[in-house]
Amino acid sequence: MASADELKQAAAQAAAQKVQSGMVVGLGTGSTAAFAVGALAQRMQKEGLQFIGVPTSERTAEQARSLGIPLATLEEQPRLDLAIDGADEIEVGSLNLIKGAGGALLREKLVEASAAELIIIADASKKVAHLGTRFPVPVEVVRFGWKTTLARVEALGCQAVLRRTAEGDPYLTDEQHYILDCQFGPIANPAKLAEQLKGTVGVVEHGLFIGMATEAIIAGPEGIETLRQS
């Protein structure tokens, strides 16, 4: 039976085939997205694929540079042909997502909102009937007054905790913000919750990606499954 990493690798390889020479491609962040960056670098070396990557985090930028992928900022390339990224949960049917376990939700959303297509890659464990079933919703907040912001977010119906590093320090995003991991349970109306979170004072961004994914490539024990919005 294939391991989770082998399934992620299979989905990443399938997504990398979508990229054509001349494209500007958003490069996601996280363990699954890292496989896609590696698969694209392989195509550059073996097939002569030429593209420009727009990374969604310093971590992804470092990986891409080490593999020889030419990079640009969102300011330099404000329109992307497609973006490839992972997800923590994928709601079957809507393709609404929870993202942000890798801590890059703000830059991911900025880059991926600028892409004509967003291809999500994942193993089959990430499919859910309702967002919030397994994963918390990451909420990026300013550091000033974060406990007050946490209380405001919890008033929306969740239990929120400050994300910390393995050493016990508050986790800092690339933009030097904190992240609250918010357990809502199954979310009946993700679009409404997204609006409520966005309107909460102190919240910079949240990990609900509503209506953004155009396609999800899911790798499972029986092969590759492609999901589209229904």
UniProtKB/Swiss-Prot annotation:
Coiled-coil region: none
Binding site residues for substrate: 29-32, 85-88, 99-102, 126
Keyword annotations: Isomerase
One Pfam family cited in the UniProt record for this chain: Rib_5-P_isom_A
Annotated catalytic residues: 108 (proton acceptor)
Protein's pathway: Carbohydrate degradation; pentose phosphate pathway; D-ribose 5-phosphate from D-ribulose 5-phosphate (non-oxidative stage): step 1/1
InterPro entries: NagB/RpiA_transferase-like, Ribose-5P_isomerase, Ribose5P_isomerase_typA_subgr, Ribose5P_isomerase_type_A
A GO term, aspect molecular function: ribose-5-phosphate isomerase activity
Listed EC numbers: 5.3.1.6
Reactions catalysed according to its record: aldehydo-D-ribose 5-phosphate = D-ribulose 5-phosphate
HAMAP family: Rib_5P_isom_A
Record's subunit section: Homodimer.
Function in brief: Catalyzes the reversible conversion of ribose-5-phosphate to ribulose 5-phosphate.
NCBIfam families noted in UniProt: PRK00702.1, rpiA
Protein name from the UniProt record: Ribose-5-phosphate isomerase A
Record organism: Synechococcus sp. (strain JA-3-3Ab) (Cyanobacteria bacterium Yellowstone A-Prime)
Gene: rpiA
